Design a protein with these regions (language model features):
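OB-fold and OB-like single-stranded nucleic-acid-recognition modules
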Residues: 1-185
Length: 185
C-alpha cells in the first residue's frame, strides 16, 4: 500500500480580503504567552475577481520549534498590520499578490440542529506557506490547482431525461484488490 498520500493545493492571486487576527496564547496552552496569527485569507485567482479561494490558518507562530523564523508568520503579520493591502479595503492597485502552497483539510465540529447533535465535516484549504510575489501566472487556470490521491467510492448521477438521481458505486472494498489497491480496512 502507498505510504504517503499526495495532498497539495497551489493558489496564486490577489489578496481579496482577510479576517486574520494577531493573538497571544493563554495560560493553559503548551507555550503560554506565545504570539500567533489565526484566521482566513481570501485569494482572488482570476482577473475578474470572481473566483475567491479561502485559506484558513489555525495557529501560525513567529518561529518554528527549532527557533528558525517563520516566513509565513511575517507575511501574515504584514497583512494584519496593513503593510500588504487587500482588494476590498485598499483597491486593486494596493492589493498584494500572493502564492499559497497549502493542503486540503477538514474542519470538523458538532452542531445542534433541531435538538440533535450532528457532526459537520467541512473541507477547506488549511495552512501552508504564503509568499508575496511580484507577478502572477498569465494562465488563470493554473493559479488554483490541487493534486490529491483519493478513492472515489460513490458518485451521484443525475439524468434529466428521467428526473431521478441514482447512485453508482465505483469502487467497493471487495473489488479494490483487483484494481491494484490494498484493501483499506
Amino acid at each position: 500500500m502507498k505510504k504517503t498520500m499526495i495532498n497539495q493545493t497551489h493558489i496564486e492571486g490577489i489578496l481579496y480580503e482577510h479576517d486574520l487576527q494577531a493573538k497571544v496564547s493563554g495560560d493553559t496552552s503548551k507555550n503560554p504567552g506565545t504570539p500567533f496569527i489565526t484566521g482566513t485569507i481570501s485569494i482572488a485567482t482570476d482577473d475578474a475577481m470572481t473566483n475567491i479561494v479561502p485559506v484558513h490558518f489555525t495557529y501560525v507562530t513567529a518561529t518554528f520549534g527549532s527557533g528558525k523564523p517563520n516566513d509565513t508568520y511575517t507575511t501574515l503579520n504584514n497583512i494584519v498590520n496593513g503593510t500588504f493591502g487587500s482588494y476590498m479595503k485598499d483597491g486593486a492597485d494596493k492589493a498584494v499578490k500572493l502564492r499559497v502552497d497549502s493542503a486540503l483539510g477538514l474542519n470538523e465540529f458538532y452542531t445542534d440542529r433541531n435538538g440533535k447533535e450532528e457532526l459537520v465535516s467541512a473541507k477547506r484549504n488549511e495552512g501552508g506557506f504564503v509568499h508575496k510575489v511580484d507577478t502572477l501566472d498569465e494562465d488563470e487556470k493554473v493559479r488554483n490547482t490541487f493534486k490529491a490521491d483519493m478513492i472515489i467510492n460513490c458518485v451521484t448521477h443525475y439524468d434529466p431525461t428521467i428526473s431521478n438521481f441514482y447512485i453508482i458505486h465505483i469502487i467497493s472494498h471487495s473489488n479494490m484488490d483487483s484494481l491494484g489497491f490494498d484493501t483499506l480496512y
